Amino acid sequence: MSEAVTRIHVGGTAGTDPYEVLVGRQLLGELAGLIGDRVKRVAVVHPEALAETGEALRADLAEQGYEAVAIQVPNAEEAKTVEVAAYCWKALGQSGFTRTDVIVGVGGGATTDLAGFVAATWLRGVRWIAVPTTVLGMVDAAVGGKTGINTAEGKNLVGAFHPPAGVLCDLAALDSLPVNDYVSGLAEIIKAGFIADPAILELIEADPQAARTPAGPHTAELIERSIKVKAEVVSGDLKESGLREILNYGHTLAHAIEKNERYKWRHGAAVSVGMHFAAELGRLAGRLDDATADRHRTVLESVGLPLHYRYDQWPKLLETMKVDKKSRGDLLRFIVLDGLAKPTVLEGPDPAVLLAAYGEVGE
């Protein structure tokens, strides 16, 4: 039986239904309720690292009367390729998967990105449920409806807006998460603090070491606050036509770093460097005060997130950023802060200012 559950409402926009994000412990008992009793088949997409979890979930669903199949995919970003998506499509076809059936994505952010993309493209869209097992997956990837895969040209360049029918954030899954993976997810939580909810930063600053562990006293509150920030934003702007862009704070440089590292860097580590860069860019552009810019470094460093990347890689990173999804024509666009919790767009910054900002990041 599940314990106390926090339910966070994500409002639907034109053409999409609202859904709930459930946060608590021992939540898998809630899954059948989200799937529904009119569904015949369920496909559980899971990474190799969660083979036992995926099979146990498949068996449990089968016991409840569903025709359940487990689809194992590579770990992390290696799953986000068109070849892996095609493998999933083949498995769905062989299972006789119809438009009334449901996909369940179990794993980190990369797995839920893939599962959502497969759901968006199979039969032009089937329902799916996210069961994120990492901090990053809970506070970012599984909430909001952005799904996608990577290409040789960049991260998440092929995808669809396809919100889940529900999200189960079982905090018990974090207990066995490697510390580096847990800390990586804190970058997205810290991002939420800077763009919208400074109370998040205060909770972390009060005890940075406690924030580094799922056993910390504020773990549930940090995750719930971060999800609420994203839920509020995406409820008003599903397809990133305006407000939702603020969620990309730190991500323009981060995605370029990830591509440059062939997706071997943790997403949160790249976002941390990206936020440091965005803070310096905001400062040098005359938008952000020194105290808030400096606060980026102290908060990120206090939980063990990186601040720097190789200086000599700037030309390659700049070229990658030019094909970023947020760019408009040849115009580079960055999310910066006008102050704490005051995100805005900086369009076409002076190349010299960009280089100077990266000079604070490069090593």
Swiss-Prot record:
Q: What general EC class does the enzyme of this chain belong to? A: lyase
Q: In which pathway does it act?
A: Metabolic intermediate biosynthesis; chorismate biosynthesis; chorismate from D-erythrose 4-phosphate and phosphoenolpyruvate: step 2/7
Per the entry, the cofactor note is: Binds 1 divalent metal cation per subunit. Can use either Co(2+) or Zn(2+).
Q: Does the keyword Transit peptide apply?
A: no
Could you confirm whether the keyword Plastid appears in this record?
A: no
Q: Which GO terms describe its cellular component?
A: cytoplasm
Positions that bind Zn(2+): 188, 251, 267
Where is this protein localized, as stated in its record? Answer: Cytoplasm
Which of UniProt's keywords are assigned here? Amino-acid biosynthesis, Aromatic amino acid biosynthesis, Cobalt, Cytoplasm, Lyase, Metal-binding, NAD, Nucleotide-binding, Zinc
Q: Which GO terms describe its biological process?
A: amino acid biosynthetic process; aromatic amino acid family biosynthetic process; chorismate biosynthetic process
Return the Pfam families for the record: DHQ_synthase (PF01761), DHQS_C (PF24621)
Could you state a single Gene Ontology molecular function term? nucleotide binding
Residues where NAD(+) binds: 109-113, 133-134, 146, 155
Name the catalysed reactions: 7-phospho-2-dehydro-3-deoxy-D-arabino-heptonate = 3-dehydroquinate + phosphate
- Reported EC number(s) for this entry are 4.2.3.4
Identify which cofactors the protein needs according to its UniProt entry: NAD(+); Co(2+); Zn(2+)
Q: Which PANTHER family match?
A: 3-DEHYDROQUINATE SYNTHASE, 3-DEHYDROQUINATE SYNTHASE, CHLOROPLASTIC
Q: Which family does it belong to?
A: Belongs to the sugar phosphate cyclases superfamily. Dehydroquinate synthase family.
Q: What's the stated role of this polypeptide?
A: Catalyzes the conversion of 3-deoxy-D-arabino-heptulosonate 7-phosphate (DAHP) to dehydroquinate (DHQ).
The protein, known as: 3-dehydroquinate synthase
For this protein's source organism, the top of the classification is: Bacteria, Bacillati, Actinomycetota, Actinomycetes, Kitasatosporales
Q: Which gene encodes it?
A: aroB
